[in-house]
């Protein structure tokens, strides 16, 4: 209560101060006729009025909070504080929140017409604090350069440095004035945490932008002139990008410019607008500053497109639909809105998406700007282009650097980060971040880290870190963060408020509440000092070890020299013996015929390796003695296969043995299962069905059975180069899980084999094409979309029941069988061992289907599949994606911030399931609980579905594809099917070590279990 009373008193005092400013300004206006003075006084009055409005809102909220606590304490003293938040939702609180509800992006916070709010003050304080720290460092650099120029007596450079120093000093003055103003508006009691624009998981912290900026500088108003300037001053506006001036207006005495510039920008973060006052012919003095991040401008333009679309179409969000009770449950409702003409989007791409507004200058004044940014994007796709194919993306694996248990990965940060070791800013550069505890530092600093990671057990920490005797714990207390402060552990900026910020009362460092327990007990000692102590300890240990080694080696040097000489002689004799044996042994003996009835024989490791039929590969060797090319069979070891008898020598070969070409595998007798292995020569390729990053998918006929299969062909070279070996093995294991029950809605595996350059997955051929092709031809009815969703739901349920998450659910990966049922295909992004509450963090998926937690690079569960399932249902029902954009970044922004829109007459159960599946909080998402798919299956959207009939295919499909023959490929892209079904030659030669990565790949579904070579 005392804190609230003190806060109320402080707010009242600030309001009175602002009123005094207004009263004094009005009095001064009556005493002078100077228009420049009038203009300056007018701007002061306007700023004070805005401050009073903000402070009065805060005052009313504090009074309501005080009354709420008193009322709660009088009624129920034990729970009074808990009732406080609910009491604050009164008219005043709602009116206050409404002022900030129209803020779409950070660009709106720079708009002069945006009222002062906690969000706006927080954003500006963080921005100004950072700019001030950078400018102070810049001024120090100028001072150092000026001293160097003085030593060299370079007058021209000295004059230039002095000019820059004066400008920098003036900027620092302006920044301090602006900071003081916003600090004065801060109220200590503010209990609300406002998300920081630079905090972890920030929606707008994106990479630099490249494109064409078209900017029109209109006019200025209420700009404060520097002291001692005459009435006839000239103003100039300069546009800077990445510390370089890119454009400048002509001088103006009327504060009007109306000049348009087109600036080509490459990987630029922000544009700086500097308003100069021309003091003399040589000196321009800055009087107003503004920074606009290009990512904020891009986001604002994207939101304008969405707003235009909403106004033209009349679609609403689920919340508005429920609140306005516009949802009408009619059987024909969805069919009416599902017609193609009802889902046509207005052409927003061609509309004017320029952003025009009065933007606030710091510390005083406004500037009128009109801006439009067009990105240079080769993969640009109009928002209203409808559904289209998109490839999946996967974060490439990087090398892990371990230091004291920390597992550091290189990470590109696109926001302002502070190194946890040296305390300097990363400044949009690559840094190192621990996978487990998120400790963040420079690339140059991570080897110097002295803190132990939480993932490292205490008993294993016998390191120099344990030997630092400085053990003074920090005294962290809850801290009201106001301004720009960074976490001393993870390096992210702290949000405004009290809930998540902690500050040490002794040394003053700040941290997130969740990071406090990770901060080492080095109160009063910097990390750099601790690193110097560690360096001394290491140096001492190394010196002592070297001294001990020198003493021991001095006594044994003579004896060791003799032993080394003797052993080298033996090695030379052994090498000579091996050399003789090698040259006398024919190099083409592997081509000798293999006995049809081998007898078990113990073979030493130095002798010939036993031949296994499933792992024979062919190479071509030229022998000058024979005058011909002999096909050599490369043999691989199978630990469980029986050894073969030694084949006859080369002299016993009377006639050449017919063998397949280099690009085929050798089919021989499986010694364990007595069954013939599948190889490349057993198939006849008929057509190409599709292409991917690593290879092709081809239609082929198995000669012996006259059965059609789809063969996925992957190049070993690309698999190795992209570190996808384990992913390929995992894909095979997922196929085996699907094979276990021959699941009706999963593509099953017939067999897999390999050659020297490729691996092959022989899969079911699903001839009806994918759902993307069908939905592009015609809109799905409600029944058809519901039917496909039910079968896909059972496929996901089977995966989840076996601890597998799919992570690449989309229309492209759902194939339509000739009988009208669907099959889920492409298991390349699946992950195993993902049971309930198990998590992973790999950044992968198809952009439009990726869940928010994946985009935020958080640990996620199998509930990401249910988010993708919601996007899938939305696309099937409405023929468009709920989250759209012209490129990946815009799509990601839409996923993180936009609400899906629905036709006002869409059935209630359809809106309900989409709303519950597309919930951004993964813990509240439908299907995220331990019941998993059962919760989805019991939703009213599936109320008319008999799940047992669906699983056993007893439900009549709503659509049957028309096929002319079993080999008809009309439902596949003609771009691929018209190609010749041949494998392109591969010139690269893989080493034996490379080939070992693919050992045990062969498999056949005819076996009771995977082949004996299958260790994948």
Swiss-Prot record:
Residue numbers annotated as active site: 808 (proton acceptor)
Annotated C2 domain residues: 195-307
One Pfam family in the UniProt entry: Pkinase
Domain AGC-kinase C-terminal: 943-1013
Domain of life: Eukaryota
Record-annotated Protein kinase domain positions: 683-942
KW Phosphoprotein (keyword) present: yes
Annotated segments matching region Disordered: 68-101, 543-602
Gene Ontology molecular functions: ATP binding; diacylglycerol-dependent serine/threonine kinase activity; lipid binding; protein serine kinase activity; protein serine/threonine kinase activity; zinc ion binding
Record field: compositional bias (Basic residues): 546-568
Gene3D superfamilies attached to this UniProt entry: 3.30.60.20, HR1 repeat, Phosphorylase Kinase, domain 1, Transferase(Phosphotransferase) domain 1
InterPro entries named among the record's database cross-references: AGC-kinase_C, C1-like_sf, C2_dom, C2_domain_sf, C2_fungal_PKC, HR1_rho-bd, HR1_rpt_sf, Kinase-like_dom_sf
Record-listed E.C. numbers: 2.7.11.13
Positions of modified residues (Phosphothreonine): 984
Keyword entries, A-Z: ATP-binding, Cell shape, Coiled coil, Kinase, Metal-binding, Nucleotide-binding, Phosphoprotein, Repeat, Serine/threonine-protein kinase, Transferase, Zinc, Zinc-finger
Composition bias type Low complexity, residue spans: 86-101, 579-590
Catalysed reaction equations from the record: L-seryl-[protein] + ATP = O-phospho-L-seryl-[protein] + ADP + H(+); L-threonyl-[protein] + ATP = O-phospho-L-threonyl-[protein] + ADP + H(+)
One example of a Gene Ontology biological process annotation: positive regulation of cell integrity MAPK cascade
PROSITE patterns documented for this protein: AGC_KINASE_CTER, C2, PROTEIN_KINASE_ATP, PROTEIN_KINASE_DOM, PROTEIN_KINASE_ST, REM_1, ZF_DAG_PE_1, ZF_DAG_PE_2
GO cellular component, one term: cell division site
Binding site for ATP: 689-697, 712
Start and end residues, zinc fingers (Phorbol-ester/DAG-type): 405-453, 473-523
Subunit and partners: Interacts with rho2.
Family statement: Belongs to the protein kinase superfamily. AGC Ser/Thr protein kinase family. PKC subfamily.
Protein name, entry field: Protein kinase C-like 2
Native species: Schizosaccharomyces pombe (strain 972 / ATCC 24843)
Source organism phylogeny: Eukaryota, Fungi, Dikarya, Ascomycota, Taphrinomycotina
């Amino acid at each position: 209560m005392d804190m609230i009373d003190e806060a109320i008193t402080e707010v009242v005092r600030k309001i009175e101060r602002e009123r005094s400013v207004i009263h004094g300004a009005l009095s001064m206006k009556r005493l002078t006729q100077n228009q420049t003075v009038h203009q300056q006084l007018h701007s002061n009055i306007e700023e004070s009025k805005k401050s009073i409005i903000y402070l009065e809102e805060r005052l009313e909220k504090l009074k309501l909070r005080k009354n709420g606590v008193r009322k709660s304490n009088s009624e129920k003293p034990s729970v009074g504080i808990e009732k406080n938040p609910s009491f604050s939702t009164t008219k005043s609180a709602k009116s206050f929140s409404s002022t900030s509800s129209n803020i779409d992006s950070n660009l709106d916070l720079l708009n002069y017409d945006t009222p002062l709010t906690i969000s706006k003050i927080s954003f500006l304080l963080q921005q100004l604090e950072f700019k001030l720290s950078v400018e102070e460092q810049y001024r120090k650099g100028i001072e150092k350069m000026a001293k160097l120029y003085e030593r060299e007596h370079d007058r021209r450079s000295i004059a230039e440095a002095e000019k820059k120093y004066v400008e920098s000093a003036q900027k620092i003055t302006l920044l301090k004035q602006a900071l003081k103003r916003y600090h004065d508006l801060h109220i200590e009691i503010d209990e609300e945490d406002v998300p920081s624009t630079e905090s972890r998981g920030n929606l707008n912290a994106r990479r630099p932008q490249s494109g064409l900026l078209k900017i029109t500088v209109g006019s200025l108003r209420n700009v404060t002139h520097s002291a001692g300037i005459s009435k006839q001053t000239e103003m100039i506006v300069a546009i800077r990008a990445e510390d370089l001036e890119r454009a400048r207006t002509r001088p103006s005495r009327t504060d009007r410019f109306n000049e348009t510039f087109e600036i080509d920008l490459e990987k630029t973060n922000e544009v700086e607008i500097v308003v100069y006052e021309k003091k003399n012919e040589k000196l321009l003095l800055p009087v107003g500053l503004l920074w606009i991040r290009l990512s904020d401008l891009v986001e604002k333009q994207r939101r304008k497109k969405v707003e235009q679309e909403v106004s033209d179409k009349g679609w609403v969000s689920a919340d508005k639909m429920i609140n306005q009770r516009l949802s009408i449950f009619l059987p024909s409702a969805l069919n009416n809105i599902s017609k193609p003409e009802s889902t046509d989007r207005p052409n927003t791409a061609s509309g004017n998406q320029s952003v025009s507004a009065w933007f606030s200058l710091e510390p005083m004044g406004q500037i009128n700007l009109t801006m439009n940014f067009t990105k240079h994007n080769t993969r640009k796709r109009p928002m209203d282009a409808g559904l289209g194919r998109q490839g999946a993306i996967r974060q490439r694996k990087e090398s892990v650097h371990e230091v004291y248990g920390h597992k550091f990965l290189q990470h590109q940060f696109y926001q302002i980060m502070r190194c946890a070791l040296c305390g300097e800013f990363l400044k949009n550069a690559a840094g190192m971040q621990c996978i487990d505890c998120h400790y963040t530092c420079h690339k140059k600093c991570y080897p110097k880290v002295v803190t132990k990671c939480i993932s490292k057990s205490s008993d294993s920490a016998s390191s120099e870190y344990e030997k630092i005797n400085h053990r003074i714990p920090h005294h962290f207390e809850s801290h009201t963060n106001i301004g720009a402060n960074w976490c001393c552990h993870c390096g992210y900026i702290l949000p405004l408020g009290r809930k998540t910020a902690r500050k040490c009362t002794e040394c003053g460092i700040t941290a997130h509440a969740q990071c406090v327990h990770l901060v080492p007990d080095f109160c009063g000692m910097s990390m750099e000092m601790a690193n110097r102590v560690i360096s001394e300890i290491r140096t001492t240990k190394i010196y002592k070890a070297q001294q001990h080694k020198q003493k021991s080696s001095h006594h044994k040097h003579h004896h060791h020299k003799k032993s080394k000489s003797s052993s080298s002689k033996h090695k030379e004799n052994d090498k000579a013996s091996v050399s003789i044996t090698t040259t006398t042994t024919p190099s083409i003996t592997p081509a000798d015929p293999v006995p049809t009835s081998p007898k078990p024989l113990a073979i030493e490791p130095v002798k010939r390796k036993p031949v296994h039929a499933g792992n024979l590969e062919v190479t071509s060797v030229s022998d000058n003695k024979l005058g011909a090319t002999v096909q050599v069979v490369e043999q691989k070891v199978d630990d469980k296969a029986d050894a073969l008898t030694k084949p006859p020598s080369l002299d016993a070969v009377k006639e050449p043995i017919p063998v397949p070409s280099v690009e085929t595998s050798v089919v021989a007798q499986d010694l364990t299962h007595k069954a013939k292995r599948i190889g490349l020569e057993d198939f006849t390729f008929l057509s190409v069905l599709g292409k991917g990053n690593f290879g092709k998918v081809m239609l082929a006929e198995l000669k012996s059975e006259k059965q059609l299969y789809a063969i996925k062909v992957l190049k070993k070279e690309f698999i190795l180069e992209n570190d996808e070996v384990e992913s390929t093995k995992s894909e095979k294991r997922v196929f085996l899980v699907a094979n276990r029950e021959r699941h009706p809605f999963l593509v099953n595996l017939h067999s897999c084999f390999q050659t020297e350059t490729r691996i092959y997955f022989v899969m079911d051929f699903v001839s009806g094409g994918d759902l993307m092709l069908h939905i592009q031809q015609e809109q799905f009815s409600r029944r058809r979309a519901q039917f496909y969703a039910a079968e896909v739901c059972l496929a996901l349920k089977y995966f989840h029941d076996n601890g597998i998450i799919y992570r690449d659910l989309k229309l492209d990966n759902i194939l339509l069988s000739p009988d009208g049922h669907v099959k889920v295909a492409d298991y390349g992004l699946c992950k195993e061992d993902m049971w309930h509450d198990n998590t992973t963090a790999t950044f992968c998926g198809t952009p439009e289907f990726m869940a928010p937690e994946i985009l935020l690079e958080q640990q996620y569960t199998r509930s990401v599949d249910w988010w993708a399932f919601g996007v899938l249902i939305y696309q099937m029902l409405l023929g468009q994606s709920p989250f759209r954009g012209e490129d990946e970044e815009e799509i990601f922004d839409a996923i993180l911030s936009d609400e899906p829109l629905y036709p006002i007459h869409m059935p209630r159960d359809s809106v309900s399931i989409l709303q519950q599946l597309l919930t951004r909080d993964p813990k509240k998402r439908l299907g995220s609980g331990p019941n998993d798919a059962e919760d989805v299956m019991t939703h009213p959207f599936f109320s008319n579905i008999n799940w047992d009939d669906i699983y056993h295919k007893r439900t009549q499909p709503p659509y049957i594809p028309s096929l002319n023959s079993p080999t008809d490929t009309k439902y596949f892209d003609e771009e691929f099917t018209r190609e010749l079904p041949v494998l392109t030659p591969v010139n690269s030669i893989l080493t034996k070590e490379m080939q070992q990565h693919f050992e045990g790949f062969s498999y056949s579904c005819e076996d009771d279990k995977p082949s004996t070579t299958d260790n994948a």
